[in-house]
């Protein structure tokens, strides 16, 4: 296993949840945090600890987004009208790397970020290599013609681990999809419970 893969799995162990619902998660072997003190019994978490865990889960799920960038999503969610928790989820689900993952063009959010970084993705016919690019309703996202035969793409599209959510319309034969509508929290197929309301509470302290 590569160091990169190990670091991804450490996120699962540190948080004590199988964030992406994958069969290879280390939690299938041991359900304690990494490190020599990982098996110590934990006391009852404080409200702050619960809020922090909710934030770390959401950050980790989307490829361990940096704290600076994640806080910007929170601030933008607060500025927008409507429910702040729903706004936060919408912004995260509009990230181009998240869309690539949801459309099953990559097996993990980490692979999706790398895929976008390397210029394999087109949005409305133009190459976009910024993982945090926000996709809009009606945008067409597709894999570049030269990249359609990459093993990682073929493995992802043929994987039975996940289904494409209803807010995305995807043709895997053409490796192209459309962002049909902005999702609500209840629409997003998280393998574990996400609590954006606790994330909002964390930043509102």
Swiss-Prot record:
Function in brief: One of the primary rRNA binding proteins, it binds directly to 16S rRNA where it nucleates assembly of the body of the 30S subunit.
Gene3D superfamilies: Ribosomal Protein S4 Delta 41, Chain A, domain 1, RNA-binding S4 domain
Chaperone in keyword set: no
Region (Disordered): 27-46
Assembly with partners or alone: Part of the 30S ribosomal subunit. Contacts protein S5. The interaction surface between S4 and S5 is involved in control of translational fidelity.
UniProt domain S4 RNA-binding: residue ranges: 118-178
InterPro entries, per database record: Ribosomal_uS4, Ribosomal_uS4_bac-type, Ribosomal_uS4_CS, Ribosomal_uS4_N, S4_RNA-bd, S4_RNA-bd_sf
An example Gene Ontology molecular-function term: rRNA binding
Record-level GO BP terms: ribosomal small subunit biogenesis; translation
Record HAMAP family: Ribosomal_uS4_B (MF_01306_B)
One Gene Ontology term, aspect cellular component: small ribosomal subunit
Organism of this sequence: Granulibacter bethesdensis (strain ATCC BAA-1260 / CGDNIH1)
Assigned protein family: Belongs to the universal ribosomal protein uS4 family.
Keywords: Ribonucleoprotein, Ribosomal protein, RNA-binding, rRNA-binding
SMART domains: Ribosomal_S4 (SM01390), S4 (SM00363)
Name of the featured protein: Small ribosomal subunit protein uS4
Highest taxon of source: Bacteria
């Amino acid at each position: 296993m590569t160091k990169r893969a190990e670091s991804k799995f450490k996120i699962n162990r540190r948080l004590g949840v199988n964030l992406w619902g994958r069969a290879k998660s280390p939690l299938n072997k041991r359900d304690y945090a990494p490190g020599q003190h990982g098996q110590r019994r934990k006391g009852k978490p404080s409200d702050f600890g619960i809020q922090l865990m909710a934030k770390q889960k959401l950050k980790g799920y989307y490829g361990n987004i940096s704290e600076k960038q994640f806080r910007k999503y929170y601030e933008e969610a607060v500025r927008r009208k409507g429910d702040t928790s729903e706004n936060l989820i919408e912004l995260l689900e509009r990230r181009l790397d998240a869309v690539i993952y949801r459309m099953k063009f990559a097996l993990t959010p980490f692979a999706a970020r790398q895929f976008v970084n390397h210029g394999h993705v087109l949005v409305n016919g133009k190459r976009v290599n910024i993982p945090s690019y926000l996709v809009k309703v009606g945008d067409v996202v597709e894999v570049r013609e030269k990249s359609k035969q990459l093993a990682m793409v073929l493995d992802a599209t043929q994987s039975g681990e996940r289904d494409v959510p209803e807010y995305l319309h995807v043709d895997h034969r053409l490796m192209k999809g459309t962002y049909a509508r902005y999702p609500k929290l209840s629409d997003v197929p998280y393998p574990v419970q996400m609590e954006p309301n606790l994330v909002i509470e964390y930043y509102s302290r």
